[in-house]
């Protein structure tokens, strides 16, 4: 994946530690690891026909500190409040270890090296210059758009900046990945016990599938868990990288996850020789790559970590070619997707920073109030809305439905005030919001605190008429479905 970027200067500083890249409209923070703490997020926009993920990052370590699907109970990388996120990101966030001639270095672990962060509307890039090792590391994050699975995309590029050939061994990934089915309460209060339910399947395929064996609820009935979290790493041509699911195979006796003892002492052969445990543990998701780089040459690891409701969805998704070109195409789409959303407020003045500010402000309104679209002839529906549950607002329990036409919960005040702009930017909405919010007024005259997802129902009589030409067995199933509350996303899934 070719990402154009400015080379960091060798003394570890750029002119101006904070600036706006006027061409890409990205915010650049040089030497971010030494700056005042900062927390933000990817917008969780995967397209109308895409599965969103939530992803939070900070200006420490490799940025991303927590991500998942839907809400905090479906985390893939554990959710932390901001102050803990700053402490933990360099240990439980993404890690990159590089071994050359028996010496091992961890990328983004030494703030004295030249490093920078580039923040886009739907992307995050970080870069570091390892002067002593004469290597440059570039990491790109973005959300997988317009697919049937929700995933965080991570692209790691290592460049040989020396004048000589280098033979490198690389270990990159997550030291801790939460299996599907483990909620936030279990992670915070009984992780040791919860490990007894955890398992990893399909490790040998290069696409490990993480889930609990059965439901963890303290009830008489036990239910099967079909959903799973997954990870996949590939090369430029699509060859799958070896996945490591047991952190002990890399860190050995260092249970603090600080030093990759096994990898440090014996390299990739030693890691592969370890017998990995695939159950009753809090697993990892690392990928291995060994390569020889000529002067100025680069190697790239393409990684995707996500969540699906069942294996069939994942298997169908993997039928397409997943390679460097796939990642490049999806990154480009992630960028154009948000550009299209904010096109209505595109502003051209003498101040490019002001122009970019208008777009970012408009995007902020979309994320809280939602983006209006028309369903059918006269139905107004808002996609992308959600409660602002970021790292510094840890009290909010946000939700982003993992389905097409995704929507979420919100505070009445936030949603109401952030839809005021639709009067100008989306006049087709008309009086819809007046009707919506006045109908939510309570008998005592007060408004409710929260606004939940919008659902639809169809009367029995109308449903019979709509599906009269459908085969009998399917007709009954569809009628039963639409006569109960449903979302557009679930209806799409039902009909697909």
Task: Name what the model sees in each region.
Residues 2-496:
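Anionic coordination/interaction segments
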């Amino acid at each position: 994946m070719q990402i154009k970027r400015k080379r960091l200067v060798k003394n570890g500083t750029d002119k101006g530690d904070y600036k706006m890249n006027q061409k890409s409209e990205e915010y650049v923070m040089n030497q971010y690891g030494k700056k005042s703490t900062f927390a933000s997020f990817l917008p969780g926009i995967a397209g109308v026909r895409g599965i969103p993920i939530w992803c939070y990052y900070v200006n420490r370590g490799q940025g991303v500190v927590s991500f998942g699907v839907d809400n905090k109970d479906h985390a893939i990388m554990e959710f932390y409040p901001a102050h803990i996120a700053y402490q933990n990101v360099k240990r439980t966030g993404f890690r990159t270890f590089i071994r050359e001639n028996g010496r091992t270095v961890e990328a983004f672990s030494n703030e004295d090296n030249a490093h920078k962060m580039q923040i886009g509307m739907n992307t995050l890039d970080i870069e570091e210059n390892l002067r002593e090792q004469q290597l440059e590391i570039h990491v790109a994050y973005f959300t997988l758009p317009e697919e049937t699975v929700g995933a965080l995309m991570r692209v790691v590029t290592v460049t040989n900046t020396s004048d000589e050939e280098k033979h490198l061994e690389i270990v990159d990934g997550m030291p801790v990945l939460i299996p599907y089915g483990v909620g936030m309460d279990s992670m915070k209060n009984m992780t040791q016990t919860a490990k007894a339910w955890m398992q990893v399947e399909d490790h040998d395929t290069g696409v490990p599938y993480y889930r609990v064996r059965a439901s963890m609820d303290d009830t008489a009935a036990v239910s099967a868990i079909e959903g799973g979290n997954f990870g996949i790493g590939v090369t430029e041509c699509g060859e799958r990288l070896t996945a490591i699911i047991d952190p002990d195979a890399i860190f050995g006796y260092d249970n603090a996850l600080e030093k990759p003892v096994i990898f440090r002492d014996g390299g990739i052969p030693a890691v592969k020789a370890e017998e990995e445990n695939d159950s009753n543990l809090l697993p990892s998701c690392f990928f291995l790559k060994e390569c020889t780089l000529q002067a100025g040459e680069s190697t790239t690891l393409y990684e995707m970590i996500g969540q699906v409701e069942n294996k069939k969805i994942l298997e169908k998704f993997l039928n397409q070619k997943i390679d460097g070109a796939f990642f490049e195409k999806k990154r480009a789409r992630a960028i154009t997707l948000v550009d299209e959303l904010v096109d209505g407020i595109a502003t051209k003045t003498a101040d490019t920073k002001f122009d970019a500010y208008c777009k970012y402000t408009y995007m902020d309104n979309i994320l809280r109030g939602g983006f209006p679209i028309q369903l059918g002839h006269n139905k107004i529906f808002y996609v992308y809305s959600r409660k602002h549950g970021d790292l510094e607002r840890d009290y909010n329990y946000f939700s982003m439905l993992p389905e097409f036409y995704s929507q979420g919960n919100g505070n009445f005040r936030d949603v109401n005030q952030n839809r005021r702009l639709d009067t100008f930017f989306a006049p087709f909405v008309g009086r819809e919001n007046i009707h919506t919010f006045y109908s939510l007024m309570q008998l005592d005259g007060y408004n409710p605190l929260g606004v939940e997802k919008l659902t639809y129902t169809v009367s029995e009589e109308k449903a019979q008429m709509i599906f009269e030409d459908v085969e009998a067995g399917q007709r009954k199933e569809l009628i039963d479905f639409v006569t109960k509350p449903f979302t557009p996303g679930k209806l799409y899934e039902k009909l697909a």
